[in-house]
Amino acid sequence: MNAMPKNWYWVLGASYCLHYNNSVKPSIFVVEDDPDISRLVRHHLENDGFSVRVYSTGANVISDAERQRPSLFVLDIMVPGKDGLELCRTVRQTPGLASVPVIFLTAKSSEADRVLGLEIGADDYIPKPFSPRELVARVKAVLRRFERPLPPSPLKVGDIAIDPAAMILTVGGQTVPTTATEFRLLDYFARHVGRVFSRDHLLDSVWRDTSYVTPRSVDVYVRRIREKIEPDPENPRYLKTVRGAGYRFEAPK
């Protein structure tokens, strides 16, 4: 067997993401009700080679995405009809869309707003006012995580089965939907059973681009993973907290 490339877990999710050197442009769905901002976002993304569809409300976004799945969503939170938070929740609950990255671009900029955005499944959170060049860089950074080939080997720990090629998590024989970031983080833990990792180590190893995430982001994702894999998330069997050090993944005895 060939040696597994170092840090391949950075890029889990390539099955849905288009490569930049592909003849098909990556498609971005932008939901923004301010026409000046939407024109600015469209201009900079299209200038960088992306195909962009802009929506001023959330009404038709999901139905259009199911017909033509985008590479990434850029969502304002405060839009008419189905707002950005509801759209993100719907994306994460919709088969075929659940692993598509979501970036919030919003005037809601408090720490509580950022944490809520991450908790419901966002992959990045950009407060307004924003730099268009930074937005394009963030879009590229999120897509880069998923653009390379996946390792083929599935993994099983206790009742948890991880199939990176299909990006499928099963727990007790039941398929459990995850976001791309949740999947990468869980896979990283499961391939290093028994090792303790600090939050900073996990940020460097799993997120790769750490410009928008903080150690608290790791806690948010750990809590969400526990809700999906643990019979009792308050008393975890698999994903344990090591006080003062970080987290450790354990195989059940």
Where are these regions (language model features)?
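His-Asp phosphorelay/catalytic-motif detector in bacterial-type signaling
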Residues: K25, R69-S71, G96-P101, Y212
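Conserved acidic carboxylate
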Residues: E32
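Active-site beta3 strand of CheY-like receiver
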Residues: Q68-V74, V79
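Non-catalytic signal-transmission and effector/linker regions of two-component phosphorelay proteins
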Residues: M1-F29, F249
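Charged docking surfaces used in two-component/phosphorelay signaling
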Residues: D36-N47
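Positively charged, aromatic-enriched patches within helix-turn-helix-type DNA-binding elements
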Residues: I168, G172-Y238, V242-A245
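Short hydrophobic/Thr-rich beta-strand motif most characteristic of the beta2 strand and flanking loop
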Residues: G49-T57, V61-D64
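Basic, amphipathic DNA-recognition helix from helix-turn-helix-like DNA-binding domains
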Residues: P80, L85, R89-T94, S99-K156
